[in-house]
């Protein structure tokens, strides 16, 4: 629905401006960003993604972007330059959306769309995008660009804020506790990862397994069957800036602290390095679980060293355990859990991640995530930072596991 509305608004832009909407002297960012804005408005009116979520998801995408164009590059564009800017790596359309989000926030409530319409009407009489902008919005385009840059920097570095939404059957006390725990772990995570989690997130708490599936279907625009598939074996599902949590599995206070710590660690890792190929799934899971354990220690729920002894003893006393090479992918992790049990798979991931941090230091994981961001491959980043491939480390770990019984 949003795509259809986007294209229809382009036609309206053309009609209002007498064909000047896409002229090189018009404002490219306002042409494309306003079409996305109208698409989001229509989607919301038709029961789809809300305008609020569209705005939050736009900034979520831009925070993860490895590179973006400068806003000034989206002012006047030749047809050839437009084609270049369509490459996803530039995130041109998301930045144009952000510029429109900033612009409409400056308009009186209820007048936002009318002001955009005035701009395209003004283009019918003047080919200058800047002049039409001044007529429609009561400020110079240069002034807006300056204010946008300030707004954009603030938005990109906005400290983490969680809007916790309790679905029916979830107590207000539980929702308040989740919000408190999510805020409490932020300084610890910033110390671990060398940067802080930024942005606004909606944390939707589902009451039980059935409600979890329903919440996924409602908020992720997927079918019930797809929602059921996503929910299987998951404590949470992420869709951009929206996190849906199976609150019925959060358990007591201790489990809640661990789970919220792990969840926030995952969000921060996604912010640092999201586009990943050639996964190292055991390291992904192991590290967010270690973050959860650090959160427990911070909350006075045991010492990290004691938890470490627990997983060390578990994997050393176990008979056959999966090889780390079996745990490189999400499918491999799932198959290992089905054959060996969730506990030993999780303990092995914790053991492997902790051994790596013991040898190379926690700062090595920051370097690893930066290399993942640069290279796009987790396994290549692993070789780059740790000086061995995952297969070699798997052999080293198995020797360490069996030689210390």
Show which residues each predicted segment covers.
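Acidic/His/Gly-enriched intrinsically disordered linker/tail segments
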Residues: 21-101, 105-160, 275-351, 355-362, ...
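Juxtacatalytic substrate-recognition/specificity segment
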Residues: 1-23, 27, 38, 128-129, ...
């Amino acid at each position: 629905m949003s795509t259809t509305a986007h294209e229809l608004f382009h036609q309206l832009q053309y009609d209002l401006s007498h064909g000047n909407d896409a002229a090189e002297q018009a404002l490219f960012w306002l042409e494309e960003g306003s079409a996305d804005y109208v698409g989001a408005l229509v989607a919301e009116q038709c029961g789809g993604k809300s305008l609020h979520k569209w705005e939050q998801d736009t900034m979520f995408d831009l925070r993860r972007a490895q590179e973006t164009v400068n806003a000034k590059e989206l002012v006047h564009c030749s047809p050839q330059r437009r084609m270049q800017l369509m490459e996803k790596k530039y995130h041109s359309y998301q930045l144009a959306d952000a510029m429109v989000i900033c612009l409409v926030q400056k308009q009186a409530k209820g007048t936002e769309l009318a002001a955009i319409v005035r701009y395209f009407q003004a283009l019918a009489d003047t080919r200058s995008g800047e002049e039409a902008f001044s007529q429609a919005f009561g400020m110079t385009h240069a002034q807006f660009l300056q204010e946008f840059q300030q707004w954009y920097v603030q938005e990109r570095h906005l400290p983490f804020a969680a809007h916790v939404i309790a679905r029916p059957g979830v107590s207000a006390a539980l929702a308040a506790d989740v919000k408190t725990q999510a805020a409490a772990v932020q300084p610890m995570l910033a110390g671990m990862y060398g940067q802080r989690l930024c942005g606004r997130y909606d944390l939707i708490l589902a009451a039980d397994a059935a409600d979890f599936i329903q919440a996924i279907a409602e908020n992720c625009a997927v079918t019930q069957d797809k929602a059921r598939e996503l929910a299987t074996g998951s404590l949470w599902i992420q869709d951009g800036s929206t996190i849906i949590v199976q609150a019925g599995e959060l358990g007591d206070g201790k489990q809640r602290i661990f789970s919220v710590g792990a969840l926030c660690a995952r969000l921060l890792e996604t912010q640092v390095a999201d586009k990943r190929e050639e996964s190292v799934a055991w390291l992904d899971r192991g590290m967010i679980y270690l973050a959860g354990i650090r959160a427990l220690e911070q909350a006075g729920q045991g010492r990290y060293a004691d938890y470490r002894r627990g997983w060390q003893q578990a994997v050393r006393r176990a008979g056959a355990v999966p090889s780390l090479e079996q745990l490189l992918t999400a499918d491999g992790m799932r198959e290992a859990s089905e054959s060996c049990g969730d506990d030993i798979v999780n303990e092995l991931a914790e053991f492997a991640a902790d051994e790596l941090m013991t040898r190379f230091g926690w700062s090595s994981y920051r370097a690893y995530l930066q290399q993942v961001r640069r290279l796009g491959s987790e396994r290549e980043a692993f070789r780059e930072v740790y000086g061995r491939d995952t297969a070699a480390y798997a052999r080293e770990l198995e020797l360490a596991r069996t030689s210390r019984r």
